[in-house]
Regions:
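A beta-strand edge to alpha-helix "cap/lid" segment located at domain peripheries
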Residues: 2-5, 10-107
Length: 107
């Protein structure tokens, strides 16, 4: 999970959860989600990228079992690479535009 920032505070807000603060707690929350037997496939769609160096923002849809979330991901440049320091996802009735695909790489 090298996407997470190492030299600053991080936070994640999973849908329906309390905010989780601190790198180790955030990483553990993702491990629990992704390693659970019922772990769903998460498909990112329609990413919109805003760069205000040294901070980058990606707003996208996340599709899980035909349902959609809207997610905001905040990144900071560390050692020349973009590292996430905040992720927030929540249910939405909106839908991504047709034909959108996730980016191949952020770095």
């Amino acid at each position: 999970m090298n996407v997470w920032a190492e030299r600053m505070e991080v936070c994640v807000v999973h849908p329906g959860w309390e905010p989780i603060y601190g790198r180790e707690a955030v990483l553990e929350s993702w491990r629990r989600i992704l390693k659970a037997p019922e772990s769903p496939e998460i498909r990112g769609q329609s990413p919109q990228v805003l760069v205000n160096d040294p901070v980058g923002t990606v707003v996208c849809f996340e599709e899980i079992k035909g349902n959609f979330l809207i997610a905001t991901n905040l990144f900071v440049k560390q050692s020349g690479r973009w590292r996430m320091f905040h992720h927030h996802a929540a249910p939405t009735d909106a839908r991504p535009s047709e034909g959108s695909a996730p980016p191949a790489s952020i770095n």
